[in-house]
Amino acid sequence: MLPIRFLAMTQKTSGSAKATSIETNDIAPIPAGERHGKAWHLFTVWSSPNLEFATIFIGALAVFAGLNVWQAIIAVALGNALAAVTHGWFSSWGPRHGVPQMVISRSAFGLRGNILPSATSTLVAGIGWFAVNTTSGAFALTTLTNLPVAASVTIIILVQVVAAFIGHNFIQKFERYAFFYLAVVFAIVAVVIISQGSYDVSPATDFKWGAFSVGVALAYGYTQGWTPFAADFTRYLPATTSPRAVGLAAGLGNFTATTLLMSVGAIAWSGVVGEGLPTTAFASALPSWLAILTLVGIAVGSVSANVLNIYSGTMSFIAAGVKLGFKTRRAIMVVIAGVVGGGISYFAVEDNFRFIFELFLLTVGYWLAPWVAILVVDRVLRKGQDIDKLITEGAKHSSIGGPIAFVVSAAVSISLFAKAEMPTVQFYGALTGPGADNGDWTALTGFIMAAFIYFVIYKVTNKK
């Protein structure tokens, strides 16, 4: 239960709705009278959910791929930068259109074709990411309290679902206040870990582009994973808000937090922490007082990330054309997604967490890279057009370019370059194989192919 003082602080908003009122807007354009907020708020909105243990552990995965500490830091910084640029740009579209990101996606995919990326986003965000982050939060709570993991999972799920159920205004407030605690705690953690780090260049081998590509792909998959939500949290801003200010605040918030914590993870797993449950191993490298604060931060950070995941995952579900007939259908879908995602976190994530998390991150990049490429090319080609008439409810817009480019590029890139390395299951594309030397070029290939295919189809089908 939230403290009364906190609830009182959240009552006041710049718009007509209170922060604790259940949101009834879903994918319809936000009316001018309900627009509120400032662009700089987006920095904390996108910093807070990244101040969590999953972000730290990506740095560890880059080290496990075969990179030394400096190579790992450069790899994750590059992956984050590539993702943050498009995340910032897509965020800037929200105030103009007033609708969620997956509704804007209709301009390239059409109303029916957009079911494909919207449904994928629902599975990945509302269920997949929810399960992963719930697990890291539950690990922290178990380490902190000695509760059974199942009990910790239940507690984390309930907190997340309640926050996402209430909706946009409450989430904005929660992220803003969580940011201050998380930023202070993880800043201290960063100083401690950096001071204990080993900065030699081991493994003392030649630079491996394959291992480097995996490090970049892991960071890209994580940070780009927020992009299907980009406009969801800017659509309430006044239409006159500066697109540049929106893009910079959102992009920098994403890049700064992810790069800092992934770098801490790379340093930590390059010689500071030992074996064991990831959260326990990480906390054991810290002074006892800081370990307690950090475990609380990991739990809060997982909630901070997942209220965005489950909220926007349900937006994607509704954008796919689901009709429930209830004004509160968004809130209802939050509960459903929480139950399904929570169920997965009980049974599928605790075992082999490292391998499942790595595979999940790479898979996120496999579908996101083509989708992002298609939207980038579409926006460039439609410069000067009235996008709103293509994406609003009731629009008859159709497009074959988006779905074809998406399916073909994803299928070809995965069949050629994808890799899945689990203790019991291995899969390799036609042009890759075991070991870090082969790398993972799936996302890059998918991006280039999707951009080219969509460009050609658009030009052919839009000849005047």
List the model feature ranges, each with a label.
Residues 2-69, 211-216, 235-245, 461-463:
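Membrane-interface "cap" regions at the ends of multi-pass membrane proteins
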Residues 29, 371-453:
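C-terminal membrane-solvent junction of multi-pass transporters and transport-like membrane proteins
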Residues 39-56, 190-196, 205-268, 288-309, ...:
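Hydrophobic, membrane-embedded alpha-helices of multi-pass small-molecule transporters
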Residues 63-74, 139-153, 169-178, 279-293, ...:
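Transmembrane helix-loop boundary segments of multi-pass membrane transporters
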Residues 76-109, 117-124, 455, 459-462:
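Juxtamembrane transmembrane-helix boundary signature
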Residues 102-106, 112, 134-151, 238, ...:
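Helix-loop-helix connectors at the membrane interface of multi-pass transporters/channels
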Residues 115-122, 144-166, 180-191, 219-230, ...:
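Transmembrane alpha-helical segments of multi-pass small-molecule transport proteins
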Residues 256-257, 320-350, 393-413, 417:
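Loop-to-transmembrane helix boundary motifs in multi-pass membrane proteins
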